[in-house]
Amino acid sequence: MQSIENQVRERVARFLEVTSVSIPLMNAPMAEVSGPALTAAMCRAGGLGVLAGDELLPEALSNAIDEVRRLAGADARFAVNLRVPPAKAPTPEGIDCQRRMLAALEDLAADLGLEPNTIEELPDFDAQFDVLLEKHVPVVSVTFGGLREEYDERLKEAGIVWMGTATTLREAKVLRAAGADLVVVQGIEAGGPRLNFESSDDEAAVGMSVLTTHAARATRLPVIASGGIAESQQVYGALVAGASAVMVGSALLRTFESTASASFKNVLPLLTDVSMRLTRCFNGRLTRVYPSELVQALDEAGLTYAPYPLQREVMRPILRAAAQQGRDDLACLPAGQAAMLAREESVEAVAARLMSFVPI
C-alpha cells in the first residue's frame, strides 16, 4: 500500500502536468481583487494565477490578459475565469421583483448620481469566449455552470485546458461529462457567491473536505479544493483528502498585490469565525460577505431580492458608483470563513507559506 505522502505526491503531479505550473496552488477569481497584478504574482510564485474576467467587457478583458503577460512573462501559465450565462430566461415574476428593487433603491441610486432605473447586464459571454481563444490563454475557468459541447470542442481544438466549479458531487460529475480537464470544488466555507448550478442552496451547503474526497473518487480528475483554506496545515489536509491542488481567495485579500480597498484590508484582522454573513442582496444568490452597512440595512428591511442575475443588474451600478466615491458603507466585501487569517504580505510569501508541507 502506498504511503499517504506518495499518494499526495502523485495527485499533485497530475495537476502540475495538466497545468504546466510548479506548485499546486491557485488564486480564486475574486471580482475587483484578482486583477492582472495578483494573477501575475501567483504565476511568478509558481502557481496558476486566475484572472477574474467575468465582469470585463471584451476590450478590457483583452487588455487585462495582455497586462498579465507583461507582468508575468509571455509564456506565463494562467487561467481566465468567465461565468456561464443562465440557462433560462428571466420569468415575469423575476422582472417584476427587479422593478420593485429599483424602486426601493431609487433614493440611494440618485444620491450616487445614477439615472433612474439604471441596470447593468452581464457582459456577452460569447464575445468574452472569443477573446480567450484569440489570445490563446493557457487555461479557461468557468463558474455558475459547465460548458456546452460546442465550447468544449473549440477549446480542445485550440489545445486549451478548461475547468469548472462544483458545489456538490452531482455537479462535479456534470463537469466531468461536459469535458472538463479539472474540477474546482467550492466548500460552503468559501467567500463570495455560491456557485451551485445543478443543486439547490440546501444541497450545495457541503463542506470542502467531504466534497473534495467524494469528487476526487467519483470523477478521477484532478480536483482543486477551495473554501476556508488559509494555512499550510489546511493545504496538506485538503491534499490528503483527495485534492490535487488548492485554491485560496480570502488568504490573499491583504496581499500587496490585492486591489481590495484599504478599509477592507484593515478590518480583516479584527474578524472572527462568525463575522461573515450569507446574503442575497448583491446578486440574488447566497453570497458570503463581511456585512457592510448596506448589507445590514437591506437584509433588515425584509426586501424580496430579485433572482440572479436580475438582482446583480440592479446592484452592479450602485456598487460601482459607491466604489468610485469611496463609500465603504455601501461596499460588497466577499470573505470566507478563514478571512481573519489573511496576512499583510506578498503573494509570493503566501505561496511559500502555504506550500511548506507539500511534497513536490
Task: Give the location of each predicted region.
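Conserved active-site-proximal phosphate/metal-binding subdomains
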Residues: 105-106, 193-224, 229-360
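Active-site entrance/lid segments in N-terminal catalytic domains of soluble metabolic enzymes
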Residues: 2-218
